[in-house]
């Protein structure tokens, strides 16, 4: 919908539409606050630092950060990537978005069936590494480009759920604080990735290499988080 509005009325109209939807949602929450929004006490700075201070938590947060740098940060410059592989910008964003929707709605079912959310995270990031590598290696293949765009959206949008599951499993008494910190790392990674990508413009190769490097660091951190979690608990905690 946003793409259609932007094409007909300009990008400012899309931003206005998003803002209008946000205002309606905020008004709805305000009117039904008592019955819809649970009362969750805010966490103190000490609680947040305690969560971050555990090695397995810190490594998990780093995973989220670096995947955010690579996946969401790269998405900021998707027109540059699409120009490299000679795919129409609107069509490419549709493919990416459909992949993202499939990933966001489908990852819960996958997570319910696997034994370890940490192993699932490693698998997702490994596939994301492969995806970015293929975009670099086959810049003139439309088939590779379309498949990789779909997979990029799917993998990027599905990466958060197993991460949040890992944080909840590792922090049963401070779950709300843990997932909030992890979510913040995702958006911080996106912002940092966007800033770094701007420095690499107009080189699409440089942007893709930067994204690839970020997710490679992410997979190393993910393996470290899994090992640290087992060491911390003495067993295979998800």
Regions found by a protein language model. Give the residues of each.
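C-terminal membrane-cytosol helix-exit motif in multi-pass small-molecule transporters
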Residues: 14, 19-39, 220-226
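Helix-to-loop junctions at the C-terminal end of transmembrane segments
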Residues: 6, 103-116, 201
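C-terminal transmembrane helical hairpin of 12-TM major facilitator-type secondary transporters
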Residues: 117-163
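Extracytoplasmic gate region of multi-pass secondary transporters
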Residues: 55-104
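Structural signature of transmembrane alpha-helices in multi-pass secondary transporters
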Residues: 1, 25, 67, 96, ...
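A late C-terminal transmembrane helix in Major Facilitator Superfamily
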Residues: 169-204, 210-213
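Juxtamembrane intracellular "pre-TM" segments in multi-pass secondary transporters
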Residues: 32-63, 238
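A membrane-interface helix-boundary motif in multi-pass transporters
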Residues: 7-20, 198-216
């Amino acid at each position: 919908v946003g793409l259609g509005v932007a094409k007909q009325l300009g990008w400012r109209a899309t931003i206005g539409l998003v803002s209008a939807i946000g205002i309606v949602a905020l008004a709805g929450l305000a009117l039904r606050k008592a019955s819809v929004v649970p009362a969750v006490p805010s966490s103190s700075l000490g609680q947040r630092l305690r969560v971050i201070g555990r090695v397995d938590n810190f490594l998990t947060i780093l995973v989220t950060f670096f995947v955010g740098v690579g996946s969401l940060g790269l998405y900021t410059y998707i027109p540059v990537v699409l120009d490299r592989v000679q795919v129409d910008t609107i069509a490419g964003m549709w493919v990416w978005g459909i992949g993202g929707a499939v990933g966001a709605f489908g990852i819960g079912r996958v997570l319910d069936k696997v034994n370890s959310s940490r192993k699932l995270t490693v698998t997702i990031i490994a596939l994301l590494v492969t995806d970015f590598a293929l975009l670099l290696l086959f810049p003139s293949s439309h088939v590779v480009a379309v498949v990789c765009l779909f997979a990029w959206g799917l993998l990027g949008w599905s990466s958060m759920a197993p991460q949040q599951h890992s944080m909840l499993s590792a922090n049963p008494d401070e779950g709300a604080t843990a997932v909030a910190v992890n979510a913040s790392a995702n958006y911080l990674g996106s912002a940092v990735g966007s800033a770094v990508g701007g420095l690499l413009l107009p080189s699409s190769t440089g942007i893709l290499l930067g994204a690839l490097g970020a997710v490679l660091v992410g997979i190393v951190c993910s393996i470290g988080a899994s090992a640290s979690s087992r060491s911390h608990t003495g067993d295979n905690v998800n």
